[in-house]
Amino acid sequence: SYSMEHFRWGKPVGRKRRPVKVYPNGVQEETSEGFPLEF
């Protein structure tokens, strides 16, 4: 999963090591990280 995150965003996701689109509930947390979400 880590390599997938690194591949998609070009940087390690950190505390979250799974695709963001799987759980829309965590989207706000991902947004605070500063990742370009596909939502």
UniProtKB/Swiss-Prot annotation:
One example of a Gene Ontology biological process annotation: regulation of corticosterone secretion
Family annotation (InterPro entries): Mcrtin_ACTH_cent, PMOC, POMC-derived_peptides
Keyword Hydrolase on entry: no
Its biological purpose: Precursor protein for pituitary hormones that regulate stress and environmental adaptation.
Membership in a protein family: Belongs to the POMC family.
Subcellular location: Secreted
A single GO cellular-component term on record: secretory granule
Name the record gives this protein: Pro-opiomelanocortin
Keywords: Amidation, Cleavage on pair of basic residues, Hormone, Secreted
Molecular function, one GO term: G protein-coupled receptor binding
Residues carrying Valine amide: V13
